[in-house]
Amino acid sequence: MDRLALIIGNSKYQRVGTLKNPQNDATDIASILSTLGFEVDYYLDLNISKMETAVRDYLLKLDEFSTGLFFFAGHGMQIDGINFLVPTDCELKDKAKTMLSCFNINKYLEGISHYKGKTNICILDACRDNPYSVS
């Protein structure tokens, strides 16, 4: 196998609404990619610590593969122009706590930028709401 995929589906959130489809979507994508010859790291309902560990482990393994694919389904948000993926334990009391307790997608993008000449695919099935925007 020369293709690696990280699949995360977050549906069961502690402080925001539960989502019906992310678990199903992640399960389907993981199954299809496995059939296509990807080595699949597949996770459901990750808190921030487990999400950061999963992404770090994926990036550390990526050097051994010619193709990497990252798929996330769940809540997302954009605050101050920064895109975040929402872990199941995200803190929403104020903007600063939210930004610290969500996964900054730039961490992933910076990580894959070191793998030049490889194919890296990122699929995000998430909204980009800003719960702190002023209308």
Question: Residues of each region from the PLM?
Answer:
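Active-site histidine-acidic residue metal-binding/catalytic motifs
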Residues: 2-15
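Hydrophobic/aromatic beta-strand patches that form the interior of the parallel beta-sheet core
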Residues: 6-8, 41-43, 121-123
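Glycine- and acidic-residue-enriched helix-capping/strand-helix junction motifs
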Residues: 12-27
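Caspase-like (clan CD) cysteine peptidase catalytic core
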Residues: 2, 46-73, 77-134
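Short beta-strand elements in bilobed, periplasmic/extracellular small-molecule ligand-binding domains
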Residues: 29, 33-43
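A generic structural signal for short coil/turn motifs at secondary-structure boundaries
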Residues: 14-18, 41-42, 94-96
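A broad detector of the eukaryotic-type serine/threonine protein kinase catalytic domain
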Residues: 12-13, 38, 56, 90
